[in-house]
Swiss-Prot record:
Homodimer. This is Serine/threonine-protein kinase-like protein CCR4. CDD domains: STKc_IRAK. PANTHER family: SERINE/THREONINE-PROTEIN KINASE-LIKE PROTEIN CCR4, SERINE_THREONINE-PROTEIN KINASE-LIKE PROTEIN CCR4. Expressed in roots, leaves, especially in trichomes, shoot apical meristems (SAM), and, to a lower extent, in floral buds. Belongs to the protein kinase superfamily. Ser/Thr protein kinase family.
């Protein structure tokens, strides 16, 4: 195991040198596709990049899934597309900045209710592949593997191509072409593979002889040589090496290519479930087969559209052999689509070529390895020591497609490997369970502070004397059913991952600091700095706590606003908290307020995304949720502004967001207080537990009331940004600390 780790770390430093020397062995195998197939219920959605690289989709039965792009995305050039059960994702790559953005659309069981979400923005992805439930990609420069939806992988590798099944992953390494898999047995050995593909429960690879080898739940294979493969559910198809036509097999020998397609030559083929699609070489039109409901066994998704031509492959910066004829005009920007044939008409990576270079390659590879080890031995030792722990990490799950969990994950992804590799300043510690148990006297009731949405919270003292707050998730409950328990566990895992990822990259005096974590199969624990004075909700709503003065309330409001402003304005992409409330604003020993609990947080859109919001199911706490977000499921930073407006009303009135009126009937704080503010009668709703504001405080209190009303505007576009909120609170606090001015407070922009 140690040897594997050191070689992996070593290769990350010298991969460019190795590739330069081994350029004779360049593989023409790509896992970035321009066609995708998605199934949900009895409906199918086929998407492809047309000859302008625009994303277009067609469903079967016709128009059963009303998928369409909006705004600037209609004319946005995509570099690839992948799909799975109920989702479609498009990759946008910017060559000028070497970055990629991955946008995903998820649709409901009936094919409606499209939800749009960006799940990645970072270093350029050169390879991208999706199974039915998850997505993985490979960065172009570092060859680092990234996956979305939790996925168990033992280590990052320098993958040239990847393939995903329902519960397994396979990768084809950089030359010399070895296959490694997780979640599937009987993986072939050797270093003579040039392409790889996966279906639901089986995977196949093409050798340098152009033979096919399959593993998993395999079917009998035709004795043919292949140029390209597509593997579906218990079936597969391949492009013949000899002439570019297609042959299919599987389904207990009951699956074959429709007779009408026997003589058609294909440039590329794709599969998902029972269905296959191929790009015809003659005119680059897309033809699909495999669905028993297709008329004559064939479906042409884009027939009748103005642009029936689809991209026959991904646009690349360079090709090992020649580019596909005419592809430069399709790609532009000096990009090209790679042809699998060399200029002499032969197919690459045949045994003849391999035999010709075999003696040279074996000898020179040996000299190369010995020379590199001798020359860079010192760097190798240093690299091994630095990355010894990190290279054992499992691959980072860079985001979630959504909150749905379709498989059982044995253990959460450890984030420290990726955080360290990105140079993250979070400095998170991974605590041991023994250390945390010792800090809390075995999680004793004496140290128990309360119960939150994530689980129980304990006060503890670490061995170095630091006072900490420890959140321990409650993953099991004998009173809940199995299904409910699985959903509950998934929610806890999601909150754990969100908190870990969000807090590890945030650093602000008005955000609670995450110190570290512990996780294993049965435990999810987060360790924070200890906040001695509890939460704002405690001091506003718990009679056992002394009420706060008006000046202290304004200072707390300003502190919390500055923390939220940092999330919205100083983090790229911005972080939307989604659960701003008084119980998530904590107070330290000096009464400095800090925002906490990032379990529901989401990364918001940036200007580069060409979208103004995220389409997500509403989440948060009743009474604080933005009505526009709740109704239209469109999340923006202004949703946090609304929630903060409710907190301001709590500070003014002392009431909870949802509380009982004089008749013991539930009452919404916004509906109760805002009308008084608009009538300039805010004095009627002020907290009666403390004396009325002094002449030095009345202007500031009125100012906060008007600001709260602005934050609670029904239309999110009319709400102030957190920059404006901070500015107005600073003015209010200044008014509170000095003699009142003669002019009155402005209510402009309020309703």
């Amino acid at each position: 195991m140690a040897l594997t780790i050191s070689i992996s770390c070593f290769s990350s430093y010298f991969v460019s040198l190795l590739l330069l020397v081994l350029s004779s062995f360049s593989f023409v195998c790509f896992s970035l596709s321009t066609v995708s197939i998605s199934h949900i219920s009895n409906q199918t959605l086929v998407c492809a990049l047309n000859n302008h690289s625009y994303l277009q989709c067609s469903s079967f039965p016709l128009n059963s899934i009303p998928f369409s792009l909006t705004g600037n995305l209609r004319n946005r050039r995509f570099s690839g597309v992948v799909s799975g059960n109920g989702f479609v994702c498009g990759l946008i790559s910017r060559l000028d900045s070497n970055t990629s953005t991955l946008l995903c659309w998820r649709f409901s069981v009936d094919g409606t209710n499209m939800l749009h979400k960006r799940i990645y923005h970072g270093p350029e992805l050169e390879e991208l592949e999706a199974g039915n439930f998850r997505i993985c990609g490979v960065e172009r420069v570092s060859r680092r593997l990234r996956c979305w939806q939790p996925y168990y992988l033992p280590r990052p590798d320098n993958y040239r191509s990847i393939a995903l099944g329902d519960n397994f992953f396979c990768g084809l390494s950089q030359p010399p072409g070895m296959i490694s898999c997780e979640g599937i047995a009987k993986v072939p050995s050797g270093d003579h593979y040039i392409a790889i593909a996966a279906g639901s429960r089986q995977a196949c690879a093409i050798t340098v002889d152009n033979d096919v080898e399959c593993w998993g739940q395999t079917q009998s294979l035709p004795r043919e040589k292949f140029l390209a493969l597509a593997v579906g559910e218990d079936r597969g198809c391949g492009v013949r090496w000899s002439n570019g036509t297609v042959v299919c097999w599987g389904n207990n020998n009951n699956f074959s290519l429709p007779q009408t397609l026997k003589d058609i030559h294909f440039t590329s083929i794709y599969a998902k479930g029972p269905m296959f699609c191929g790009v015809a070489t003659r005119n680059y039109t897309l033809i699909c087969w495999g669905n028993e409901n297709f008329k004559s066994g064939v479906f042409t998704p884009f027939q009748g559209l103005i642009s029936q031509v689809v991209m026959p492959g991904p646009c690349r910066r360079e090709c090992p052999y020649r580019p596909l004829s005419g592809s430069q005009s399709l790609c532009g920007n000096e990009l090209m689509i790679c042809d699998l044939k060399r200029n002499d008409g032969e197919f690459p990576d045949t045994r003849a070529q391999n035999s010709k270079n075999k003696t040279w390659s074996r000898r020179n590879i040996a000299f190369l390895v010995v020379g590199c080890v001798g020359t860079f031995s010192l760097l190798l030792v240093i690299s091994f020591l630095i990355f010894k722990s990190h290279c054992r990490c499992r691959v980072h799950d860079s985001g979630r497609l959504d909150d749905t969990r379709t498989i059982d994950i044995p253990k959460l992804e450890k984030r420290l490997c990726t955080l360290a590799s990105l140079g993250n300043p979070g400095q998170l510690m991974e605590f041991s369970i023994d250390e945390l148990a010792l800090a809390t006297d075995g999680f004793s009731v004496r140290f128990h502070l309360g119960i939150g949405s994530f689980g129980s919270v304990y006060q503890g003292v670490l061995s170095d004397g630091r006072h900490v707050a420890i959140k321990r998730a409650e993953l099991t409950n004998p009173t809940l059913s199995g299904t409910t328990m699985r959903h509950r566990r998934a929610d806890k895992d999601s909150a754990f991952v969100n908190e870990l990822e969000s807090m590890s990259r945030l650093n602000h005096k008005n955000l609670v600091r995450l110190l570290g974590f512990y996780e294993d199969t049965e435990e999810r624990i987060l360790v924070y700095e200890y906040m001695k004075n509890g939460s704002l909700a405690d001091h506003l709503h718990n009679p056992q706590f002394d009420p706060l003065s008006w000046q202290t309330r304004l200072m707390i409001a300003l502190d919390a606003a500055r923390g939220i402003q940092y999330l919205h304005e100083f983090i790229v992409p911005p972080v939307i908290h989604r659960d701003i409330k008084s119980s998530n604003i904590l107070l330290d020993a000096t009464w400095t307020a800090k925002v906490s609990d990032f379990g529901l947080s989401q990364m918001g859109p940036t200007e580069e995304d060409d979208v103004s919001h995220l389409s997500l199911h509403a989440a948060g706490t009743l009474g604080y949720i933005d009505p526009e977000y709740y109704k239209f499921q469109q999340l923006t930073t202004k949703s946090d502004v609304y929630s903060f407006g409710v907190v301001l009303l709590e500070l003014l009135s002392g009431h909870k967001a949802i509380h009982n009126n004089e008749d013991e009937n539930p009452r919404n704080l916004v509906e109760y207080v805002v009308p008084y503010i608009l009538l300039d009668e805010a004095h009627r709703i002020l907290d009666q537990r403390i004396p009325p504001p002094t002449p030095y405080e009345i202007e500031a209190v009125a100012h906060v009331g008007y600001l709260a009303a602005e934050c609670l505007m029904p239309c999110s576009r009319k709400r102030p940004s957190m920059v404006e909120v901070v500015s107005k609170l600073e003015s209010a606090l200044a008014a509170c600390l000095t003699a009142p001015k003669t002019e009155t407070v402005s209510r402009s922009n309020t309703y």
